[in-house]
Amino acid sequence: MAAGFFISKSVGIVGIVLALGAVATIIALSVVYAQEKNKSSGGSGGSDTTSTTTASTTTTSTTTASTTAAPNNPWNRWRLPTALKPESYEVTLQPFLTPDDNNMYIFKGNSSVVFLCEEATDLILIHSNKLNYTLQGGFHASLHAVNGSTPPTISNTWLETNTQYLVLQLAGPLQQGQHYRLFSIFTGELADDLAGFYRSEYTEGNVTKVVATTQMQAPDARKAFPCFDEPAMKAVFTVTMIHPSDHTAISNMPVHSTYQLQMDGQSWNVTQFDPTPRMSTYLLAFIVSQFDYVENNTGKVQIRIWGRPAAIAEGQGEYALEKTGPILSFFERHYNTAYPLPKSDQVGLPDFNAGAMENWGLVTYRENSLLYDNAYSSIGNKERVVTVIAHELAHQWFGNLVTLRWWNDLWLNEGFASYVEYLGADSAEPTWDIKDLMVLNELYTVMATDALTTSHPLTFREDEINTPAQISEVFDSIAYSKGASVLRMLSDFLTEDVFKEGLQSYLHDFSYNNTVYTDLWDHLQEAVNKNSVPLPDSIGAIMDRWTLQMGFPVVTVNTLTGSVQQSHFLLDSNSTVERPSVFNYTWIVPITWMTPSRTGDRYWLVDVSATNSDFSVGSSTWLLLNLNVSGYFRVNYNQENWDQLLQQLSNNHQAIPVINRAQIIDDAFNLARAQQVSVTLALNTTRFLSGETAYMPWQAALNNLQYFQLMFDRSEVFGAMTKYIQKQVTPLFEYYRTATNNWTAIPSALMDQYNEINAISTACSYGIAECQQLATALYQQWRQNVSNNPIAPNLRSAIYCSAVATGGEEVWDFIWERFLEAPVVSEADKLRTALTCSTETWILQRYLQYTIDPTKIRKQDATSTINSIASNVVGQPLAWDFIRSNWRTLFGQYGGGSFSFSRLISAVTQRFNTEFELKQLEQFKADNQDIGFGSGTRALEQALERTRTNINWVKENKEVVHAWFRAETASS
């Protein structure tokens, strides 16, 4: 292990030495640091002796970890007291990128935090998790008064591991209005757990390269250094990284200075960065790597795209570089606020838990969300890159410049970014019509969850969200997709210009500070008043009904009488809503509408029921509500109007806007699941698809028919269903075969490319021989010349899956080898997912075992791979057995804070529709109470509710559905 020293530049002290070599030297020189700081600033810390303490044990009685369970003790509460307010940190870290004598990767560091005492107190609580401290005078930290006076002495310190605090008890109180500095020296593990300061790896040739990187959100900055780790505790950060000289260090801000040191024959660089603006701990980031970058310095903001050298050399960063500048410019205009920092670094990491993270000025991504290679990446990969970039850059203002006060309002942060990502992406790719996709990707996806009694409001009470697992659980589809959908609705009824006006004043007023969601409502109300926007009530009164109660309404209209009413839409109409609502689950609903002859003015439904004469159109024409699905609600009609809409779809479907053709399908299927219309009416909405070539209606139908597949692919119903889908998709397959000159040309429009993929994937997966023969032929061509893949990137997922499904071990092994050597992560993702398409039980069982072996499947991909296996009818019971037998291992790896953990529970239970499976799920819950379910707790309750709903739905609809499919295919 390398040894030596570095020069630390802490506040008010220059030239204090912190050893970086052998443990004894580290301890001795750490004491020198503490002693010198005491001399300079009146330190408190006991006698000048040192020892080392770990996160679980200590060496002296003064630092023994507390075992007190009294909930009234401040250190047993999850939230910080408000007595202390941090103002600045100086953090120095040195990651060691080779294992130590214990075969562990570690980092060492010191941290100095200056804080203001706002209320006199004799207790300091600061977050710390899995850090080992070098004791100073027998204590974990030393305390100094900034003005040179003598601070109170420390009487006791310990690590409260449950609530993740370093606790310091003082012999006297800190004085109100006085500034203090807390200094600590620590060591942590540079683990591969994807949290805090962690280790990522990749291979270059046969050499393993190690990257030291970060993921602080939500509660993991405390795993990198002791800090007041709550979003409202904003401060200025000065970061210094000590790193091998052949590596580069980057952080939120530009490099301020760098110099080189020789320590025991190894060359180290000490890189200090400019101080950050006031910001939250969860947005801090630093990376030490041998990555390369491409850059654009033509504007006032330096833009760099970083990644593995091979990926950058192959041009995989060029698309992100091309689009980042225009997206930043778009948001500067949209927010009427200049980008707040001098640079924008974006880094593609080989190992990353989330999709991306909006660290201020240093955004981190999974490689598949930043890197793009035209030779390997599909149009879906390209859309993913531009939308994720737009999402993260949107946060640079909304979330970073102005930040939520606490995680109970996460929806405003993530929902807003999930909405405006479509606006930013549209500005970068204006020919794609990408804003329309929000209806399918966000609104309809989240409604499936929000129609459960186990859903939750967008905004929680602040006291409902406390523990790290509770915080992680808030990062769900409700926060992201419902938040986006509700804000889209708000922007629509205000108009985008008025919405932007309120947004801009909100950002200007709260820059570098924290807010609650009502602050945005106040600024939007000012814009409404200024522009005289007619509304039935205040912004707060309207929007509170959408944010403070879960769910959404179904609006039912009778076109014979003009009556319109609303009710809480639940997939299981017999379920009981236990969460109370002061609004009694009613909403103020903005309704847009049209008939064949005109488009009407927006109508507001403010009561449970009303009558609107404009809606009384009779039985000989149709009425359509919720144009472009701008409102977050479903629509039901009297049978006569449904018949008219179905007739219009049959005669000339293009008379109805394309988004609303998708709406008719999605509403009908979900109303049928809720027993508000017949299941045959829902199925009838798919008849016109034999003449439809647009993507959105087809995707809406496939999404809903997938539920039928999940419910019936283990029964005789699936045979008749397969014949029907073959009948409907064959014209689409033929249409795209002709349009693409036998699959050799790529359609120009984004939506057309997506629907070509639908045509291939549906035809192959439902057994159309011509499609499967195409897949086999393309696979064989590739097999004969591995270096020349003849399959177009857009079609690879479908073709690979079909080849694996219809092949055996030989095909699986070939695809596995290609996965291991894939040069682009988007290609590796396609191959990894295709491997789950096997119909061989033993192969899928082996693949499940691979998911818990990080040498075969990266940790970041483990849960999504299990999910894909579970989506396979052969793999589903295997995945369920695997989850149950490996729950402790999986929970230990992913349960506490993984964004994907809740999806794991949902995926493996999505087919459950029998009493036996319900009992298994209930037993699973009972058997694992001691371990817990962490961030999957709510997902488990939702799985139980879905299963009960599925049981009832299948009982009531199986025979009717079977008869309908048989009748539709009787002549085929």
From Swiss-Prot:
The active site is at residue 392. Residues 32-972 are extracellular. Its cofactor is Zn(2+). Pfam families: ERAP1_C, Peptidase_M1, Peptidase_M1_N. Glycans are attached at residues 38, 110, 132, 147, 206, 269, 296, 513, 574, 584, 628, 684, 742, 785. Residues 37-77 are annotated as: Disordered. Residues 2-10 are cytoplasmic. Zn(2+) binds at residues 391, 395, 414. The record marks 480 as: Transition state stabilizer. GO terms for biological process: peptide catabolic process; proteolysis. It is found in: Cell membrane. InterPro entries: Aminopeptidase_N-like_N, Aminopeptidase_N-like_N_sf, ERAP1-like_C_dom, M1_APN-typ, Peptidase_M1, Peptidase_M1_aminopeptidases, Peptidase_M1_dom, Peptidase_M4/M1_CTD_sf. Detected in the plasma and granule fractions of egg yolk (at protein level). GO terms for cellular component: cytoplasm; extracellular space; plasma membrane. The keyword Zinc applies. Residues 47-70 have a biased composition (Low complexity). Its EC number is 3.4.11.20. Its main location: membrane. SUPFAM superfamilies: Leukotriene A4 hydrolase N-terminal domain, Metalloproteases ('zincins'), catalytic domain. Broad specificity aminopeptidase. Degrades a variety of peptides possessing various N-terminal amino acids including hydrophobic, basic and acidic amino acids. Preferentially hydrolyzes small peptides consisting of 4 or 5 amino acids. Hydrolyzes the N-terminal Xaa-Pro bonds in the chicken brain peptide Leu-Pro-Leu-Arg-PheNH2, the substance P fragment Arg-Pro-Lys-Pro and the bradykinin fragment Arg-Pro-Pro-Gly-Phe. Homodimer. This is Aminopeptidase Ey. It comes from Gallus gallus (Chicken). The gene is ANPEP.
